[in-house]
Regions:
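Bacterial N-terminal signal peptides
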Residues: 9-18
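Boundary at the C-terminal end of the N-terminal hydrophobic targeting segment
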Residues: 22-25
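N-terminal substrate-binding region of glycoside hydrolase catalytic domains
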Residues: 27-179, 184-203, 241-243, 252-253, ...
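Bacterial N-terminal signal peptides that target proteins for export
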Residues: 1-9
Length: 404
């Protein structure tokens, strides 16, 4: 990426820019001796009732909230319409309203916000579907840059883009970013494999290497000013992998195990990131957090064998820290499948899981998936409360967990 300075046309003009190519930039992961405790639940917070949601999140002593920042593909997306000036967050095609709102609520609540850049707008991939990557990864890099400018902590939104009922002036900073979600799962990134000659290429890792590079470059290209340099404490996490994969390209629903995915992404040019992220869910409700997968499931990465993944991250990229950006146990009731555990066991497993994570010096964050159960039984019932708001024992355990 060439050096350039972009001036954003807006009332209360603020300076943002593109630094030297991230291929030569030096960003090192923060080393942390503590564990940030947080929540991943966008339905509850992003497009739910934010006033009530953040009152609850504060009462739970939440330190970090993760939500998706949709580039395209949903009604909540920022860029369903193609911008004329994609690196400018003030471009009128962009719709940041939901994200401005949640950024202000999080800031006012003393909660750090994490944005996961996700899904491709149809104009960027020829209408191939939101889980398919863009034809040009420059488009993704430009969007990541625009988002990082807007939430740099130094940006005043143009009057036409600002909801003045939530306040005016500089938008709050967001310094935690993740690139996509579970790219080793075809629900989130497709295709997982393509045939190249007589072999199968892990296409999800090939494309993800470029997704990671684009988001990393875009976020880290933002300057407060040429003199003051980059936004302080900005971190981009890559990986964000799900715990399992069948490694079966000929099946109707192929996926990639997280170790194979990391190795392939490195091979295909995933250059750098500040933190790695992973979702080390158990395979069943009767597996405690310390359970180590064996046999045919040995390449599944859960909390009990998380050091296997950390060792691979170290081998390829050095001793980067790990963010656990999703974790949880579903409860029975209401989930009567193999994934459900009792309300009492969920609370016990939560305490055990956070103790395991806290004892690992390279795990610096752990986010529980859901405040409330999802209403559809085919969804997730790992909430601290039921869909009607009845608190499970895990509610009080989460409140009392040690915070970093």
């Amino acid at each position: 990426m060439r050096n350039r300075i972009i001036r954003v046309a807006a009332i209360g003009l603020l300076l943002a820019g593109v630094a030297a190519s991230s291929a030569t930039a030096k960003h090192t992961a923060k080393k942390s001796s503590h564990l940030l405790v947080g929540i991943n639940d966008e339905a509850f917070s992003l497009y739910g009732n934010p006033a009530a949601a953040f009152e609850t999140l504060r009462s739970l002593n939440t330190q970090v909230l993760r939500v998706n920042l949709y580039w395209g593909g949903t009604k909540w997306a920022v860029a369903n319409s193609r911008p004329a000036d994609p690196t400018n967050p003030g471009d009128p095609a962009y719709n940041w309203a939901l994200y401005d709102r949640i950024a202000r609520y999080a800031h006012d609540s003393g909660i750090q916000l994490m944005f996961t850049i996700l899904f491709t707008p149809s104009w960027a991939n020829g209408g191939a579907g939101r889980t398919h990557p863009p034809k040009s990864f420059t488009a993704l890099r430009d969007f990541a840059h625009a988002a990082a400018v807007r939430y740099s902590g130094f940006f005043n939104a143009p009057a036409g883009q600002l909801d003045t009922t939530l306040g005016s002036g500089t938008l709050p900073a967001v310094t935690m970013w993740t690139a996509w979600n579970e790219p080793n799962n075809p629900i989130w990134l497709a295709p997982q494999y393509v045939r190249v000659g007589k072999t199968w290429r892990v296409q999800s890792a090939y494309n993800y290497a470029r997704i990671c590079n684009a988001v990393y470059d875009g976020v880290h290209s933002v300057l407060i000013s040429p003199e003051r340099g980059p936004v302080p404490d900005e971190q981009v996490a890559c990986g964000v992998t799900g715990p399992k994969g069948n490694d079966a390209p000929r099946t109707s629903r192929p996926s990639v195990d997280p170790l194979t995915f990391l190795s392939a992404a490195h091979k295909f040019g995933m250059k750098q990131f500040d933190v790695y992220a992973h979702h080390p869910y158990a395979a069943a409700g009767n597996e405690p957090p310390g359970y180590v997968p064996k046999g045919k499931n040995a390449r599944r990465i859960q909390l009990g064998n998380i050091n296997v993944l950390l060792n691979e991250v170290r081998r390829f990229y050095g001793p980067k820290n790990l963010w656990i950006t999703e974790y949880g146990y579903e409860t029975n009731p209401p989930d009567h499948t193999i994934m459900g555990t009792s309300w009492t066991k969920q609370a016990q497993y939560m305490r055990q899981a956070y103790a395991i994570a806290r004892a690992n010096p390279r795990i610096s964050m752990m986010l529980w998936f859901l405040v409330r159960d999802q209403p559809q039984i085919g969804g997730w019932q790992s909430g601290l409360a039921t869909v009607t708001g009845a608190q499970k024992p895990a509610w009080s355990v989460f409140k009392s967990l040690p915070r970093g």
